[in-house]
Amino acid sequence: MGIRIQELCKQFEDFTALAGIDLDIRQGELLALLGPSGSGKTTLLRIIAGLEHADAGRVLFGDEDATMMSVQARRVGFVFQHYALFKHMSVYENVAFGLRVRRGKARWPESQISARVFELLSLVQLDGLEQRYPMQLSGGQRQRVALARALAIEPRVLLLDEPFGALDAQVRRDLRRWLREIHDRTGLTTVFVTHDQEEALELADRVAILNQGRIEQVASPAEVYNRPSSPFVYSFVGAVNRLPGCVGADGLEVAGIVLSCPPQLSGWGAVDLYVRPEDLVLDAQEGWLAIVLWSQRSGPRMRVRARLEHSAHEVEIELSSATDEYVEGQKLRLIPRHYGVFFSESGG
């Protein structure tokens, strides 16, 4: 089931959490809401769940207006960062909880509940642990129980609020791959909040980048990384070098060299050029002359910090499959093979 967000606004006293959000979440996709603290990503997720209500705008589940629906009526599965498991209940009882609290005709017979619980424990790879209690499980196992509990009620939508934030790095990496497999098997429309770029880019079909209550860009992980739509996205997702320049009669000039001007850039004025470290390449003849400040090898990759000659501007370069060593004071020529250009605040 798809979700449509239309002109959603939310204010907390003097703080604007959401400022007119429009977003279409496709049926069956895994969408990441990525942004810094205070960007509005968790507020948006909670409004989709029905845990918060917007001041203005609408939330549609398919063609159904869910804006004023209760949490129960929306039938969403929700997984929190800190598990929210019942400590006094076994794994089995935690997963069965949402099914047992149903009333009337919606209540399943115990045999059906039991079958569903064991089906889910198998899905999340916790077979044989149904009688354990949360305190007897690792952090990764607890999060799997939380996901099984969310799936037990057969939700129309699955929502996850920084589900791996409390876990160590290796467990997070393992669970990311596992969650992607679970999503592909269930086909549920899934929205998850994260501030971890790597997590969003590895897991999601699409990423929505939020900043100060607004969406900066919605695109595939590759497009968000390779073709950011704004200076904020360039700066927030991945490492980037920023260099001032200008667009004039002679074209785009940055730090003393003329570069090809992107066709979408119309007008003249001061600009900022954004180029990722891996997109600065060595060139024997053309480009900026730079002086090495330091270098650091990490396996086959080499990271080099250099200062552009006759300039105070420093850049970071990442060279893959590098065989040469680079020493302080060594001179290099650099050319950007791929970059973004935006008018600066003073020039646009």
From Swiss-Prot:
Q: Which GO terms describe its cellular component?
A: ATP-binding cassette (ABC) transporter complex
PROSITE patterns assigned: ABC_TRANSPORTER_1, ABC_TRANSPORTER_2, CYSA
Keyword set includes Membrane? yes
Q: Where does ATP bind?
A: 35-42
Catalytic activities: sulfate(out) + ATP + H2O = sulfate(in) + ADP + phosphate + H(+); thiosulfate(out) + ATP + H2O = thiosulfate(in) + ADP + phosphate + H(+)
An example molecular function term from Gene Ontology annotations: ABC-type sulfate transporter activity
Q: How does it sit in the membrane?
A: Peripheral membrane protein
- EC annotation from Swiss-Prot or TrEMBL: 7.3.2.3
Describe the location of the ABC transporter domain by residue ranges.
3-237
**What SMART domains has UniProt attached to this entry?**
AAA
Which subcellular locations apply to this protein? Cell inner membrane
Which purpose does this protein serve, as stated in its record?
Part of the ABC transporter complex CysAWTP involved in sulfate/thiosulfate import. Responsible for energy coupling to the transport system.
Report what the protein is called: Sulfate/thiosulfate import ATP-binding protein CysA
Q: Which organism is it from?
A: Xylella fastidiosa (strain 9a5c)
